[in-house]
């Protein structure tokens, strides 16, 4: 709440100026007169009291207690301004302060207008889009440094009546203008609207408005996590990136939440509308729980959806570059390659025109093939890339010097030269030293694409005509190197890449050989990028049925639920099935959970409380075994963020006639399970995952 603009204003009516030395009874009489004239909107009303007592923390606390928690604003609640102790002069003054704040809100409302006709006291008109807003300069100057500089400096806006503002939504401007004039910031649960209000408050220097907006976005994020609503959480993350708001400042677990539910977030409709920045952050993170081939399919689909917009943006940038080049250097300099795109230059990159021979731009036009080749002799160009700062090392050391030397010697890249890349012993020694200091953290951006160099091999400039022409190759060059290719099965990777037709057949063959090299700890190259060390494996993915299961609300007719998950492996005669229990925290122990079938046998889970408040979990048979059975069992209590999960496993050969239960007598502390949110889903339940694998029988 913005208190200062409210409590620093003192109303001095004509009847009060000559009565400053009256006793307390006169003060109380003036307060009564003020109550009778509470609806007046005149600032100079003769019935307003003079606030003589200095403002203390108790007064501010009482005002803070009046605000309504929803919507989040800094207004005074009219229904909570009654004081039970009317005989105390201090309490009477507190009431006056509360009424003063309310009157201030009502009074300065006349300075705010949103109609075709200006209000009586407005002296400036803002035109935002197709709407006009009327306001008072004195209020704007008093509350915002931005408007203070606009109206008190030498800017042309200080002398004109109507000001046109661009780059702001009319609804956002009206919300912030209302907050400036009457101290009310109306925030709903639309994260796009709230993030825009945050940005505009930041522009105007309204610190308290930023705090209120940030707090609201934190509540929105918490609501998405508790539902849970993966698609909306992904929307929020992308909105924060577009608004340049740090994700962790809104909610510390928002990023990890989206990554843990990757099987949902990468297949939802919201995924295809996220920005390139958000996609790159997702692919860089080791906490992305999804199989690499599935990630590849989702990335290709995203590139198809966003290629048209990307191509249009590149064409606009190229036109602007050509226009500026024509104006500065003449017609000859204006005929640059149409396959060149906007680039960020490294501090140590020596580019003298050879940037048009980059792998990321050389494949757009068959007619420009010769133009690309004529620049090869100039050396490898250094350009900016989303992958430029990826590094596992905690030090500031980079490979720029090594890259320069390699470029001068002809560079090492894909094709026939990839064998030379792995023979650089000095580089490998440096990488080994840095690997010792590496620590993994799912909550932070992390990538093993530590460094790369652009290939200058002429054989790499061949253009494949049967590529998928619907995809922007520049987008592919940005995101494909972030895929963890070495995590793939070679046969599946070849089949998938061959069907997609997104890279040349020669590069597919080289890629498969490089996958084998990376598995041996050697250098890894792909699409002209040279990776200094193999990347880390991602975390274990969960089946999509599991993720969908724990994101659905409980059936109100049952206490607990069991969700059978599809079999996800079957080899060498083994079969594996998972069964997900969702258990209410208030379940009465001991309890027998719902039954399920596996290998034509009936099983169920028993929960018991053991000594010292320990939860015991047992696997029980529905009937006696008619023949021996060998199985392995994995039981897991799935934490809200997955990495907090608790797992226990055993392998057991059950003899014929067995009809008892087998399990873990001390699984998890009940106090930990019930009281800590990290194991809670929907705040009133926890998840138990049972995984059974048959050995034989």
Curated annotation (Swiss-Prot):
Tissues of expression: Expressed strongly in presumptive spore (prespore or psp) cells during the late G2 phase of cell cycle. Present at a low level in vegetative cells.
Biased composition range(s): Acidic residues: 416-453
Polar residues composition-biased segments: 58-72
Domain BTB: 122-189
Organism expressing this protein natively: Dictyostelium discoideum (Social amoeba)
Membrane spanning stretches: none
Induction: Up-regulated by starvation.
Positions of the UniProt region annotated as Disordered: 1-94, 311-455
Function: Required for normal morphogenesis and cell-type stability.
Disruption of the gene: reported phenotype: Mutant shows pleiotropic effects that include an inability of the spore mass to go all the way to the top. The upper cup, a tissue that derives from prestalk cells and anterior-like cells (ALCs), does not develop properly; it is unable to lift the spore mass to the top of the fruiting body, likely due to defective intercellular adhesion. The differentiated state becomes unstable; prespore cells transdifferentiate into prestalk and vice versa. Cells that find themselves in the wrong environment sort out to the zone that is appropriate to their new identity.
Listed name of the protein: Trishanku
Alphabetized InterPro entries for the sequence: BACK, BTB/POZ_dom, MATH/TRAF_dom, SKP1/BTB/POZ_sf
One matching Pfam family: BTB
SUPFAM superfamilies membership: POZ domain, TRAF domain-like
Listed Low complexity bias regions: 12-47, 73-91, 312-331, 353-363
Annotated signal sequence range: none
Gene3D superfamilies the record matches: Potassium Channel Kv1.1, Chain A
Bias-annotated ranges (Basic residues): 332-344
GO biological process: aggregation involved in sorocarp development; calcium-independent cell-cell adhesion via plasma membrane cell-adhesion molecules; cell fate commitment; cell fate determination; culmination involved in sorocarp development; sporulation resulting in formation of a cellular spore
